[in-house]
């Protein structure tokens, strides 16, 4: 398994890993067939509150679960991007855009928190640097690059589709929506959108169901927020 990670906080990343052989440096490449990062000793058990924990720890939980998901679904080439990188160091991601056809799966962390655990003031739908909007822009460029590589004339196809979790099951269970989904090459599942009474309605079985409806290996991207970490990968 191949994993490439882009992150903004090298020092915290290194401190969060328990073994010298597990240090992650941005950007990094690890072949998990020869050496697998062991995150099993992280002493966090589905915390109900994250206000006093370093957000980098949660990045490792996301990465661990992302790897498990990809292993279950035979996705072997993975990219993981800290959303802050997209906002602050966007140029560093140019090679991932260039090589987007190489990835089976791209995960994006959603971190609307400052280091003291408070919601960032910049986390606003009206803010041009909104992490979610920046993530969509990045994925749109990935999709644009895919179309270029395929020399496709299907420019009218939207480069990404975004669904709130509370609509996800409905979409999967209606044929007309499934037909529409097949026109997309990239799916983003947002499970942290405000206003949803139950942002955890979808499960790993729903994701598997969606994947099975495709024949052309779409990229499926998750904005994996703090609220769902104990449930998204159950």
Predicted regions and their residues:
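GT-A fold catalytic core of metal-dependent nucleotide-sugar glycosyltransferases
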Residues: 54, 58-115, 125, 132-133, ...
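Catalytic core and acceptor-binding pocket of nucleotide-sugar-dependent glycosyltransferases
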Residues: 133-234
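A structural signal for short, well-ordered beta-strand segments and their strand-loop junctions
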Residues: 24-31, 77-82, 105-108, 179-183, ...
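Short catalytic/ligand-binding loop motif for oxyanion handling, primarily in non-cytosolic enzymes
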Residues: 13-14, 86-89, 95, 114-117, ...
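A recurrent flexible, glycine/aromatic-enriched loop bordering the glycosyltransferase active site
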Residues: 113-130, 153-160
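Well-ordered, non-membrane alpha-helical segments in soluble/globular domains
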Residues: 12-21, 92-94, 163-166
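N-terminal anchoring/stem segment of glycosyltransferases
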Residues: 1-61, 68-76, 137, 206-207, ...
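A short secondary-structure junction signal
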Residues: 91-92, 117-118, 142-146
């Amino acid at each position: 398994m191949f994993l490439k990670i882009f992150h903004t906080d090298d020092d915290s990343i290194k401190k969060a890993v328990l073994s010298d052989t597990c240090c992650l440096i941005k950007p990094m490449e690890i072949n998990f067939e020869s050496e697998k990062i062991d995150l099993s000793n992280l002493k966090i058990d589905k915390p109900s509150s994250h206000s006093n924990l370093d957000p980098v720890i949660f990045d490792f939980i996301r990465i661990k679960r992302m790897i498990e998901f990809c292993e279950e679904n035979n996705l072997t080439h993975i990219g993981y991007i800290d959303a802050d990188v997209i906002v602050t160091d966007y140029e560093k991601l140019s090679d991932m855009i260039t090589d987007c056809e190489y990835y089976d799966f791209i995960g994006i962390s959603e971190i609307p928190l400052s280091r003291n655990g408070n919601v960032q003031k910049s986390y606003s739908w009206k803010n041009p640097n909104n992490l979610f909007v920046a993530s969509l822009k990045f994925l749109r460029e990935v999709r644009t690059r895919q179309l270029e590589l395929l020399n496709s004339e299907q420019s009218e196809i939207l480069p990404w589709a975004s669904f709130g979790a509370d609509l996800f099951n409905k979409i999967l269970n209606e044929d007309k929506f499934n037909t529409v989904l097949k026109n997309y090459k990239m799916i983003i599942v947002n499970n942290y959108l405000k206003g949803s009474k139950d942002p955890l309605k979808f499960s790993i079985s729903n994701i598997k169901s969606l994947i099975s409806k495709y024949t052309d290996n779409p990229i499926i991207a998750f904005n994996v927020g703090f609220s769902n970490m104990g449930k998204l990968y159950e």
